[in-house]
């Protein structure tokens, strides 16, 4: 695997001033000290952060947090570190964590690429979820798409052997790119022939259910890190 440069001039997101509800603001202000992990650029010890030894998963760009909360609730035996840059989504997930009394989620409000490069040690993750990343549909913006070869190499370096990367998208041309990029990583192997069926652990969101009723498709791509890689 390549040496990963700390310099990253092209970001896969734009920080927009989204509407922050009063409930999201309160949750962000009151619950970040309890569930939030400040980003310092120093390595994190996930066993200490979660106060136990358990399978560890990284959730990248969780939106409003519905899927992340449902996954964590259904799998209390696992721990989930959730990275997101947008405050409304962070507040929304924190509110759900408190309401559902989840003890297996911690959040970090920072760019996931920096978190992977500087805060997570090699081979510390059992899985990575990247559900519905920004598709950047215009051709001139494709360079901003998160799933690129260098990023996948970085993800792979943080996975334990046997750990997996799961990406889901509802943009067909992005799905094709994701499948091509992950297929090009020599340390990964596809868990399916082409696209994978949606696994039971990824719940259908209300947005996705509505899209499916309208005939929209969703593509899941799941690759696993080879043993000995």
Swiss-Prot record:
Substrate binds at residues 138, 170, 205-208. The active site is at 134. It catalyses: guanosine(46) in tRNA + S-adenosyl-L-methionine = N(7)-methylguanosine(46) in tRNA + S-adenosyl-L-homocysteine. S-adenosyl-L-methionine binds at residues 59, 84, 111, 134. GO terms for cellular component: tRNA methyltransferase complex. One of its GO terms (molecular function) is tRNA (guanine(46)-N7)-methyltransferase activity. Its EC number is 2.1.1.33. Gene3D superfamilies: Vaccinia Virus protein VP39. It comes from the Bacteria. It is an enzyme of class 2 (transferase). Pathway: tRNA modification; N(7)-methylguanine-tRNA biosynthesis. InterPro entries: SAM-dependent_MTases_sf (IPR029063), tRNA_(Gua-N-7)_MeTrfase_Trmb (IPR003358), tRNA_methyltr_TrmB_bact (IPR055361). Keywords: Methyltransferase, S-adenosyl-L-methionine, Transferase, tRNA processing. Belongs to the class I-like SAM-binding methyltransferase superfamily. TrmB family. Catalyzes the formation of N(7)-methylguanine at position 46 (m7G46) in tRNA. This is tRNA (guanine-N(7)-)-methyltransferase. It comes from Nitrosospira multiformis (strain ATCC 25196 / NCIMB 11849 / C 71). The gene is trmB.
């Amino acid at each position: 695997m390549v040496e990963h440069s700390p310099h990253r001039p092209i970001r896969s997101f734009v920080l927009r001033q989204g509407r922050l509800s009063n409930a999201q603001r309160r949750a962000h202000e009151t619950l970040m000290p309890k569930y939030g992990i400040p980003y310092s650029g120093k390595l994190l010890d996930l066993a200490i952060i979660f106060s136990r030894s358990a399978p560890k998963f990284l959730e990248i760009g969780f939106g409003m947090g519905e899927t992340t909360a449902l996954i964590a609730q259904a799998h209390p035996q696992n721990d989930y570190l959730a990275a997101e840059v947008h405050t409304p989504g962070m507040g929304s997930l924190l509110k759900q964590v408190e309401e559902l009394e989840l003890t297996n989620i911690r959040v970090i409000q920072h760019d996931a690429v920096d978190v992977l490069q500087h805060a997570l040690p090699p081979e510390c993750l059992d899985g990575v979820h990247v559900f519905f990343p920004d598709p950047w549909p215009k051709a001139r913006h494709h360079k901003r798409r998160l799933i690129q070869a260098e990023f996948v190499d970085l993800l792979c370096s943080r996975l334990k052997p046997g750990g997996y990367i799961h990406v889901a998208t509802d943009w067909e041309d992005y799905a094709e790119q994701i499948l091509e990029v992950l297929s090009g990583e020599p340390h990964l192997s596809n868990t399916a022939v082409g696209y994978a069926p949606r696994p039971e652990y990824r719940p259908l969101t209300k947005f996705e259910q509505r899209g499916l009723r309208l005939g929209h498709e969703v593509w899941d791509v799941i690759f696993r890190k080879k043993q000995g890689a």
